Amino acid sequence: MSWQAYIDNLIANGKVDKAALYSRAGDALWAQSGSFELQQPEITEIAKGFDSAEGLQTSGLHVQGQKYFLLRADDRSIYGKHEAEGVICVRTKQTILIAHYPSGVQPGEATTLVEKLADYLINVGY
């Protein structure tokens, strides 16, 4: 399956409306939905946030120019929220998966789907 197919399948469920897959270092975009592409400082901020959440705790999480309130940050997952929408970032062995859910979607439903895809990627060596 191509990287793009993973993103397309994630979007098809209706719980996530935008997603992208980056290299673990955040230096290469592997797949994306539509125009969901982060600016380099945004993906760098996320990539560093997995190792140290201090910067995210201080200044928030930024995705496509929007600031999200940091809900959780550890070495695997970063969650952010802005009003009724949110962002889920999960780091695997070789990738960073970033997904956005719109208002009207329960955060737990979107999070479960994104985390399951990350688990799958980890299990197949990515």
Curated annotation (Swiss-Prot):
<keyword id="KW-0009">Actin-binding</keyword>
<dbReference type="InterPro" id="IPR005455">
    <property type="entry name" value="PFN_euk"/>
</dbReference>
<dbReference type="GO" id="GO:0005938">
    <property type="term" value="C:cell cortex"/>
</dbReference>
<dbReference type="Pfam" id="PF00235">
    <property type="entry name" value="Profilin"/>
</dbReference>
<dbReference type="GO" id="GO:0090338">
    <property type="term" value="P:positive regulation of formin-nucleated actin cable assembly"/>
</dbReference>
<dbReference type="GO" id="GO:1903475">
    <property type="term" value="P:mitotic actomyosin contractile ring assembly"/>
</dbReference>
<comment type="similarity">
    <text>Belongs to the profilin family.</text>
</comment>
<dbReference type="GO" id="GO:0005856">
    <property type="term" value="C:cytoskeleton"/>
</dbReference>
<dbReference type="InterPro" id="IPR048278">
    <property type="entry name" value="PFN"/>
</dbReference>
<dbReference type="GO" id="GO:0070064">
    <property type="term" value="F:proline-rich region binding"/>
</dbReference>
<dbReference type="InterPro" id="IPR036140">
    <property type="entry name" value="PFN_sf"/>
</dbReference>
<dbReference type="GO" id="GO:0005546">
    <property type="term" value="F:phosphatidylinositol-4,5-bisphosphate binding"/>
</dbReference>
<dbReference type="GO" id="GO:0046907">
    <property type="term" value="P:intracellular transport"/>
</dbReference>
<keyword id="KW-0206">Cytoskeleton</keyword>
<dbReference type="GO" id="GO:0140311">
    <property type="term" value="F:protein sequestering activity"/>
</dbReference>
<keyword id="KW-0963">Cytoplasm</keyword>
<dbReference type="GO" id="GO:0003785">
    <property type="term" value="F:actin monomer binding"/>
</dbReference>
<comment type="function">
    <text>Binds to actin and affects the structure of the cytoskeleton. At high concentrations, profilin prevents the polymerization of actin, whereas it enhances it at low concentrations. By binding to PIP2, it inhibits the formation of IP3 and DG.</text>
</comment>
<dbReference type="GO" id="GO:0005829">
    <property type="term" value="C:cytosol"/>
</dbReference>
<dbReference type="InterPro" id="IPR027310">
    <property type="entry name" value="Profilin_CS"/>
</dbReference>
<protein>
    <recommendedName>
        <fullName>Profilin</fullName>
    </recommendedName>
</protein>
<comment type="subunit">
    <text>Occurs in many kinds of cells as a complex with monomeric actin in a 1:1 ratio.</text>
</comment>
